[in-house]
């Protein structure tokens, strides 16, 4: 009984140590650790001695099937993606030290820059970095990063597309845009032939002639050619109404009596009065 109680007491005394992660600020923070390694490298440079270059390591990152969906397409050193999409960066301290957590970042590019900053502080000029000093981006990095999809250089055009672009006579330049002004001789007195559609409609013996005219007018104003289409429709007079008016006038002339009076003038001429 006593042995059992003693064993139970020993188990209760043993407490599992909790692994603590370094904070971003404080005496044992990431910034303080990087600062300390930077000071150590400066001392080595003053003593004309250099630190051993870090091992090349592997760029495989997480194991196959592990990490985020874009982790397999990223080749940045010290960068990997979590399953929920965040990018993290970590670096191993010199002299086979432990891995230093650098933090989580929204993009792989930011995580790669954080790794380079820590690598230069820890290893000095012999550090293996993702980007050189004179470049901000790398073409061999993460293909999924949107910032790497755009290049500052001129875009290459396939040969088939070049032929299509070179065929038109117009050339687009980077200079100020110039408005093309055609020659006045080619523009003036140019009128599109008129199209006339004549429609005849009959109803109760009445005929109505409707004429539709479509005219294209070409106007020139300050070197800019304006094409204007005018639709004109004319409704002419009613033929039947005109005929009725003529018949009425003729019948009225027949009913009126014509009075003719012969008068002799002094000058010998014959005068008729109506």
Swiss-Prot record:
This is Dehydration-responsive element-binding protein 2A. Its main location: nucleus. It comes from Oryza sativa subsp. indica. GO terms for molecular function: DNA-binding transcription factor activity; transcription cis-regulatory region binding. It is found in: Nucleus. PROSITE patterns: AP2_ERF. Belongs to the AP2/ERF transcription factor family. ERF subfamily. SUPFAM superfamilies: DNA-binding domain. Pfam families: AP2. Residues 1-10, 35-50 have a biased composition (Basic and acidic residues). GO terms for cellular component: nucleus. Disulfide bonds: none annotated. CDD domains: AP2. SMART domains: AP2. PANTHER family: DEHYDRATION-RESPONSIVE ELEMENT-BINDING PROTEIN 2C, DEHYDRATION-RESPONSIVE ELEMENT-BINDING PROTEIN 2D. Residues 1-75 are annotated as: Disordered. InterPro entries: AP2/ERF_dom, AP2/ERF_dom_sf, DNA-bd_dom_sf. Keywords: Activator, DNA-binding, Nucleus, Stress response, Transcription, Transcription regulation. Transcriptional activator that binds specifically to the DNA sequence 5'-[AG]CCGAC-3'. Binding to the C-repeat/DRE element mediates high salinity- and dehydration-inducible transcription.
């Amino acid at each position: 009984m006593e042995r059992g109680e003693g064993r139970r007491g020993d188990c209760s005394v043993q407490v599992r140590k909790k692994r603590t992660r370094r904070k971003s600020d404080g005496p044992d923070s990431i910034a303080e650790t990087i600062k300390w390694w930077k000071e150590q490298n400066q001392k080595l440079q003053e003593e004309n001695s250099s630190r051993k270059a870090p091992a090349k390591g592997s760029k495989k990152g997480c194991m196959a099937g592990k990490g985020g969906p874009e982790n397999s397409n990223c080749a940045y050193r010290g960068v990997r993606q979590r399953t929920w999409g965040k990018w993290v960066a970590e670096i191993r301290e010199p002299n086979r030290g432990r891995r230093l957590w650098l933090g989580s970042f929204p993009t792989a590019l930011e995580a790669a820059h954080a790794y380079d900053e820590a690598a230069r502080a820890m290893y000095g000029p012999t550090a293996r970095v993702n980007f050189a000093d004179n470049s901000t981006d790398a073409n061999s990095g993460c293909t999924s990063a949107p910032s790497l999809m755009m290049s500052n250089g001129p875009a290459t055009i396939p040969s088939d597309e070049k032929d299509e672009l070179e065929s038109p006579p117009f050339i687009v330049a980077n200079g100020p845009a110039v408005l093309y002004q055609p020659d006045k001789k080619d523009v003036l007195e140019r009128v599109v032939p008129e199209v006339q559609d004549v429609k005849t409609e009959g109803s109760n013996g009445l005929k109505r002639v409707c004429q539709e005219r479509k005219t294209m007018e070409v106007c020139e104003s300050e070197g800019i050619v304006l094409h204007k289409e005018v639709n004109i429709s004319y409704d002419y007079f009613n033929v039947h109404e005109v005929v009725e008016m003529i018949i009425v006038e003729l019948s009225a002339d027949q009913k009126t009596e014509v009075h003719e009076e012969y008068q002799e003038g002094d000058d010998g001429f014959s005068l008729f009065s109506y």
